Amino acid sequence: MNYFELFKFPPTFDIDTAVLADRYRELQRAVHPDKFANDTEQQRLLSVQRTAQVNDGYQTLKDPIRRAEHMLSLRGIDLSHETTTVKDTAFLMQQMEWREALEDIRESIDHQAIINELYDSFAAYRLKLTKLLAAQLSSGSDEDALLAADQVRKLKFMAKLQDELTRIEDALLD
């Protein structure tokens, strides 16, 4: 299913999330199972299916990584079950530095300084990747679509690093 069509958006990476939320509420009102309580069993089941599609579409378009994956899947590039790793040497080196910094947090006297520095570093790198991803997705070329897939892989890795940093921070606060 093309969620951009469902929510009446052009298939572009940059979308207005406030408009997305408004359209989500409109679609929810239109397909909500309560509206079909007195209809046939088939109509009620169809309503439940459509509600699930609307919910999944909203969650997909709301999240930049999932939105990019959806855009790529519409172009025949499915990243949902892949095990391809990032081959960018500079990114792999940066990844090792971040991993070492994560390991150093617990032994550090000033935990919060390292944590804040990592949050800032992650945010800056994600912003850079996201801008590059948006440009690659908008180009329309097959080569750029493959490059965009690499950016998505990197962003997924960044999300995992962010989660790991948050877990470490939470553990230190306990």
Swiss-Prot record:
InterPro entries: DnaJ_domain, HscB, HscB_C_sf, HscB_oligo_C, J_dom_sf. It comes from the Bacteria. Pfam families: HSCB_C (PF07743). SMART domains: DnaJ. One of its GO terms (cellular component) is iron-sulfur cluster transfer complex. Residues 2-74 form the J domain. GO terms for molecular function: ATPase activator activity; protein-folding chaperone binding. One of its GO terms (biological process) is [2Fe-2S] cluster assembly. Keywords: Chaperone. Interacts with HscA and stimulates its ATPase activity. Co-chaperone involved in the maturation of iron-sulfur cluster-containing proteins. Seems to help targeting proteins to be folded toward HscA. HAMAP family: HscB. Belongs to the HscB family. This is Co-chaperone protein HscB homolog.
